[in-house]
C-alpha cells in the first residue's frame, strides 16, 4: 500500500496516493497500530522527498474519526501540525491530550513550547501552575513560571517561584542551580536591591563559573555603579572569551574599559 502511494506521489498523482493510504486507513481488518505505521512511513517519505506534508492531514483526520481516544495518534498529529506551523490546530490536539490524560508530560511540554513561542504569558502561567501540581519534581515549570511573572512585573511572585524551585533541584545539577540563582539576581537588581542581586550572582557563579549570561550581567551592573571594576573586567573578559562573536558581551567589555578610562581598548572592542 505504501509503495503504491509513494509511486503515485512520485509521478505527481497526489489524489491516487492519498486514495491508497485512505483505503488502508478505513480497512477494518487492520488495527490502529498498523494504520499509524502506514501513515508514519508515508509522512516520512514525503519529508525525505522534500514534498509538503499537508496532504497527510486529511488522512490523520480520517484515522482520528475512527479512533478518537487514541492518545499516540493525537500526539503524532499535533507534532506534524507544529512542524507545519499550524500553531492553533496543534495546540488544540495537545490540549485534548492533557484533558484525556493529565499525566502526559510530553503533551504539556508541547503546549508550553507553543505558549512560549507565541509569547502568551497568561497561558504560560496556566500551564506551569498546573504542571507544578502534576509534576512537583520538575524544575522547568518553576523556571518558566518565574520568567512569566517577571515579564508581568510580578517580581515577588517570580522570586518566590525561583526560590521554591531551588529546593527541588539536586545539588548535582549545577547548571540549573546556577541559572536559577542568575534569575534571582536579575529580579533583585530590577527591584533595586543590589546587595541581594550580587549575592545571588556570586552564588550562581559558585555553581557554574562559566555561566556566560550571569558573567555579562554581573559585570555590566557593577560597571554602572562604578564598583569593583577589575572584577567586572575579569568577568566580562571571560564572557567574551566564551562567546567572542556576541555583540552584547563585546559592548559590555568595551563599556567597562571606557568607565575605567581606557579609551583605546574601549574603541577597539566597540568597533569589533
What do these predicted regions represent?
Residues 1-272:
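Alpha-solenoid helical repeat scaffolds
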Amino acid at each position: 500500500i505504501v509503495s503504491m502511494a509513494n509511486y503515485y506521489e512520485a509521478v505527481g498523482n497526489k489524489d491516487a496516493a492519498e486514495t491508497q493510504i485512505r483505503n488502508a486507513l478505513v480497512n477494518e481488518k487492520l488495527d490502529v497500530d498498523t494504520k499509524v505505521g502506514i501513515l508514519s512511513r508515508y509522512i516520512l517519505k514525503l519529508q525525505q522527498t522534500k514534498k509538503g506534508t499537508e496532504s497527510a492531514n486529511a488522512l490523520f483526520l480520517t484515522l482520528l474519526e475512527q479512533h478518537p481516544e487514541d492518545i499516540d495518534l493525537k500526539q503524532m498529529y499535533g507534532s506534524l501540525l507544529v512542524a507545519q506551523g499550524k500553531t492553533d490546530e496543534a495546540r488544540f490536539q495537545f490540549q485534548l491530550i492533557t484533558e484525556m490524560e493529565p499525566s502526559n508530560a510530553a503533551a504539556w511540554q508541547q503546549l508550553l513550547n507553543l505558549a512560549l513561542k507565541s509569547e502568551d504569558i497568561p497561558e504560560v502561567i496556566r500551564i506551569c501552575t498546573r504542571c507544578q501540581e502534576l509534576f512537583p519534581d520538575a524544575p522547568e515549570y518553576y523556571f518558566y513560571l518565574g520568567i512569566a511573572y517577571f515579564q508581568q512585573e510580578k517580581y515577588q511572585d517570580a522570586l518566590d517561584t525561583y526560590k521554591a524551585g531551588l529546593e527541588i533541584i539536586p545539588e548535582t545539577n549545577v547548571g540549573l542551580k546556577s541559572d536559577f540563582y542568575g534569575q534571582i539576581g536579575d529580579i533583585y537588581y530590577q527591584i533595586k536591591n543590589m546587595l541581594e542581586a550580587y549575592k545571588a550572582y556570586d552564588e550562581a557563579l559558585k555553581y557554574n563559573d562559566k555561566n556566560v549570561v550571569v558573567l555579562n550581567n554581573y559585570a555590566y551592573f557593577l560597571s554602572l555603579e562604578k564598583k569593583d571594576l577589575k572584577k567586572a573586567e575579569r568577568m566580562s573578559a571571560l564572557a567574551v572569551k566564551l562567546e567572542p562573536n556576541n555583540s552584547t558581551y563585546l559592548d559590555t567589555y568595551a563599556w567597562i574599559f571606557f568607565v575605567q578610562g581606557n579609551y583605546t581598548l574601549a574603541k577597539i572592542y566597540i568597533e569589533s
